[in-house]
Regions:
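Hinge/capping helix and adjacent helix->loop/strand transition within the periplasmic-binding protein
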Residues: 502-509
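Substrate-binding clefts and catalytic carboxylate motifs of secreted carbohydrate-active enzymes
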Residues: 487-498
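Short coil/turn segments
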Residues: 491-492, 592-594
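Alpha-helical solenoid repeat scaffolds of the TPR/TPR-like class and their adjacent stem/linker regions
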Residues: 1-483, 501, 532-541, 546, ...
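Short hydrophobic "strand-cap" motifs at the C-terminus of beta-strands
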Residues: 318, 489-490, 518, 548
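Glycosyltransferase donor-sugar binding loop
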Residues: 350-356, 514-529
Length: 695
């Protein structure tokens, strides 16, 4: 009857049998698979089958499948393992055990299960594909490619295998090859929503924003309520400056899944681009996020860490950006200095949330005592791992940026937790003890807008690693062409209409001047046209504008040789771009804002020794732009010595920054140790080098 599809009839028959023999394991087993075939709840029947047939491997396997479909992966693992105790060569059990283990974040064990299945039957395409996926999450990208290609040798028409290969190729930075893999998957299965979404993600990385948006919209036609795709679409629209449309996507994702913290993070990050948002309002938004994260966590209140203030501290780093990324550029030199000068005092253990491994990743990894992929590991499991690793201080390097794991911090896996570097506002997470800042970006009067205690490093929260590429600082271009070239290489989303209006006044006030803009969005003809029209509405025509798309880092840095003065956008100023600009000998005119983020330029320029390049308001910004552009000899002199000036400044002095940073970590740890010994926690503590914190 089962093979004939007569499921209802078979169900009725087995129920009659069970009325007569309620302990018949075989009848419960038949009923369970029959209910499964009809899409009905089969859990109880399959559980009873496993109970009454304790030595039946298939009964335990079937129960595991039912548990797995309901998301009970831990219980499914137990059932599969029982099946394998009975029948060690049960291939399906090995395969599904691998899937369940991967869902739980036990990637090494998942790989072992997949490999065991392949030892028994080597030509299982799906298992090779799943193995490749798990290896990708572990950061073993070359091995992942091998597994995906093996899956495709066995089954060239596996859309899933092509999709998985594309994901790994993207992590390797082979974007064009990744696009080809996704396109092949979509040739096989045009309605493969995940492949459309992944294609969009890769196209966005290539700067093809319009095509990326089209891919996301196609994915949403297939699966309208897919929250991950809604986030992807929102981020691409944000890149295109369509902030209201992006906001709609993030809010729609939250309507579908009110507890979707990733959507909430994207919504909060978007606010950074908007001018009119009072600090108190943003704080309340962040608190709501923090409350939601707290409701999803069961925070630890006890740890096994020894409360000794001078012990060697185990410091955990959670980030998706320990690679060729601005965070990587800042953290590399700092970690190298800390590893060199504080060996035996500090140990760094990284928990990367991204599979990408590049040359910068390898250099950062060399500074760490441990490296454990956090990709695909649920917060609860990762929190347990971090606690078991004995991490004393856990540092978030992402805030509400992409690939963050802020919800993890709500579990409080370490006794001391801090946010630093990758973000520029409060996280809103109550379990985050500290936010590392400096006196320029967060004056003491602003402490009330943070859920964390603000710990101020004495000079700067940023220390940049000089680029490895050898690029000379050339004489100011205005000396040879007779016109001042202003420039901005920031993300184009930062350049709002208020910024354009002010820059238009600058161009109108400085004769024969022009503006050089370089950003990934400018690879799109539609974006170039939009920007030309926006400037035209403020009286600036195309012959005063030079628009270029993104470029490899060496070419991007060399482009500064064509810029005399950099103009900082607002309220979201440059960070990495500003420091790189200074390294290339180009001063940056920045506007002082009223928030942590909008004062980032203030901190950079003061630490660079250029306070006269900080404008108090838009009128001062215009006046300073005119004044600096009118004194070309002074500008040329400044340019010739600026690289040497900043290389000896706090912005590039890694050993100096490392001293301040180690003292800050030691101070945070001392506070916790004091609390464990029953001593009152001080409201303000000043270390011997001047680091301080307050509420």
């Amino acid at each position: 009857m089962f093979n004939a599809g007569r499921y209802q009839e078979l169900e009725n028959w087995t129920r009659l049998l069970l009325e007569r023999c309620p302990k018949s394991g075989f009848s419960w087993k038949v009923l369970g698979v029959t209910l499964q075939a009809q899409g009905k709840d089969a859990l109880t029947a399959l559980q009873k089958a496993a109970e009454f047939l304790p030595e039946d491997a298939q009964a335990h396997y079937n129960f595991g499948v039912a548990l797995q479909h309901l998301g009970h992966h831990d219980r499914a693992v137990a059932s599969y393992r029982r099946a394998l105790e009975i029948k060690a060569d049960y291939v399906e059990a090995h395969c599904n055990l691998g899937v369940a283990l991967k869902e739980l974040g036990h990637l090494d064990e998942a790989v072992t299960s997949y490999r065991r299945a392949l030892e028994i039957i080597p030509d299982l395409a799906t298992v090779h594909s799943n193995l490749g996926n798990a290896l990708k999450d572990l950061g073993q990208l070359d091995d992942s490619v091998v597994s995906c290609l093996r899956a495709l040798e066995i089954n060239p028409d596996s859309a899933e295998a092509h999709n998985n290969l594309g994901i790994t190729l993207m992590a390797l930075g082979q974007l064009d090859n990744a696009v080809a893999s996704y396109c092949r998957a979509l040739e096989i299965d045009p309605d493969y929503a995940e492949a459309h979404n992944n294609l969009g993600i890769t196209l966005r990385a290539l700067g093809q924003l319009d095509n990326a948006v089209a891919s996301y919209r196609r994915a949403l036609e297939i699966r309208p309520d897919d929250t991950d795709t809604l986030i992807s679409l929102g981020v691409a629209l944000q890149d295109l400056g369509q902030l209201d449309n992006a906001l709609t996507c993030f809010r729609r994702a939250l309507e579908i899944s009110p507890d979707f913290l990733k959507a909430y993070s994207n919504l909060l990050f978007l606010h950074n681009y908007k001018i009119a948002h009072p600090a108190a309002t943003l704080l309340e938004e962040k608190r709501r996020y923090g409350n939601l994260a707290a409701r999803q966590a069961r925070p630890y209140t006890e740890w096994h860490n020894v409360a000794e203030s001078e012990k060697c501290l185990r410091v955990g780093l959670v980030s998706g950006d320990l690679r060729n990324h601005p965070v990587g550029f800042f953290v590399e030199g700092v970690l190298a200095a800390l590893a060199s000068n504080y060996s035996g005092r500090l140990e760094f253990i990284a928990y990367p949330t991204h599979s990408c491994v590049d040359t910068l990743t390898e250099r950062i990894k060399a500074c760490c005592h441990g490296w454990h992929s956090a990709v695909g590991i649920p917060d609860e499991n990762l929190a347990r791992r971090i606690r078991e690793d004995g991490i004393d201080i856990l540092i978030d390097l992402s805030g509400h940026t992409a690939l963050n794991r802020l919800p993890l911090f709500a579990w409080k896996p370490a006794p001391v937790q801090a946010s630093w570097l990758g973000y520029f506002a409060t996280t809103g997470v109550a379990a985050m003890d500290y936010l590392i800042a400096d006196p320029w970006t967060v004056p003491e009067s602003e402490d009330i807008y943070f859920t964390e205690r603000v710990w101020r490093l004495p000079e700067t929260r940023l220390c940049f690693t000089p680029p490895e590429v050898e690029i000379d600082v050339l004489p100011a271009p205005s000396l040879s062409n007779g016109c001042v070239t202003f420039g901005c290489f920031n993300n184009l989303t930062k350049i709002n209409e208020t910024v354009v209006a002010l820059w238009a006044q600058v161009l109108q006030a400085v004769p024969r001047s022009r503006l050089f803009l370089k950003a990934k969005q400018l690879q799109e003809a539609s974006e170039r046209q939009r920007l030309l029209e926006l400037f035209a509405s403020h009286g600036i025509h195309g012959d005063q504008l030079l628009l270029e798309g993104s470029a490899p880092r060496a070419d991007y840095l060399a482009a500064y040789q064509r810029v005399d003065i950099a103009l900082d956008p607002f309220p979201f100023p440059g960070g990495t771009t500003s420091v790189e600009c200074l390294w290339m000998g180009v001063p940056v005119l920045t506007l002082e804002g009223n928030s942590f983020l909008s004062r980032q330029g203030v901190g950079i320029m003061n630490n660079a020794g250029l306070p006269d390049w900080i404008a108090a308001d838009t009128n001062d910004y215009l006046a300073k732009a005119i004044a600096h552009a009118s004194d070309l000899p002074r500008l040329a002199t400044l340019r010739s010595g600026l690289r040497d000036q900043v290389l000896t400044s706090p912005l590039f002095d890694a050993p100096r920054f490392a001293r301040h940073f180690e003292a800050a970590l030691r101070g945070m740890w001392a506070q916790w140790c004091n609390q464990q010994q029953g001593e009152p926690s001080m409201c303000t503590m000043v270390s011997k080098n001047g680091s301080s914190f307050g509420r």
